[in-house]
UniProtKB/Swiss-Prot annotation:
Domain DRBM: 154-224
Cellular compartment(s): Cytoplasm
Subunit structure: Homodimer.
Cofactor (UniProt): Mg(2+)
Name this polypeptide is given: Ribonuclease 3
Keyword ATP-binding part of the UniProt annotation: no
GO CC field: cytoplasm
UniProt-listed InterPro entries: dsRBD_dom, RNase_III, RNase_III_dom, RNase_III_sf
Keywords of the record: Cytoplasm, Endonuclease, Hydrolase, Magnesium, Metal-binding, mRNA processing, Nuclease, RNA-binding, rRNA processing, rRNA-binding, tRNA processing
Family recorded in the similarity comment: Belongs to the ribonuclease III family.
NCBIfam families on file: RNaseIII (TIGR02191)
UniProt catalytic activity: Endonucleolytic cleavage to 5'-phosphomonoester
Amino acid sequence: MNSPIEKLTRQLGYQFQDDELLNLALTHRSANSKHNERLEFLGDSILSFVIADELYHRFPKVNEGDMSRMRATLVRGNTLAELGREFGLGDYLKLGPGELKSGGFRRDSILADAVEAIIGAVYLDSDLEVVRGIVLNWYASRLEAIKPGVSQKDPKTRLQEFLQGRRKPLPVYTVTNIKGEAHNQEFTVECDIAGMDKPVVGRGTSRRKAEQAAAELALEQLTNG
């Protein structure tokens, strides 16, 4: 293996017996007719099973509805994309010229798909018990943080419900700045809430993410203040 891939395998916590499986997992359909979508399909199912099995045993008294909500939070695209960024996957993806130009290596959907493809590749390179250990290691902090009965709703929804429950006006979100090129922008959003001294500022790679970041900070201030 060359040095960059060795760095990635250290991040993943797994040394492949068949390097070609990892190469395939990192190959987007825009780059080659042999790409990672079949591995992604396999990895998606394995991830769902491993997380469901872990939640079932970790929370023996929790009902199906809560477990489903927790699993959905853990396996959704933005969680997988966060994992991909933690591994630095964008530096290793094989993309076609169009995707490279448009910043595909930063796109949540491409990063999430690659994480699922790597899970599928690890399974084919080893077995279910090995891939279970790898996935649970990746998810250790998230599994510790997630709680049954706690709303898995996004911050904007939780903030809206918090304010409605106290008969307060809904927040007003305003984009105050956008910087960077079209495929690599940073949005700054102010969240104005009646009764707060000043707006709460959030930033993100899209307007939605910046609004969610601002809502999360506003919730922290409202609940801790």
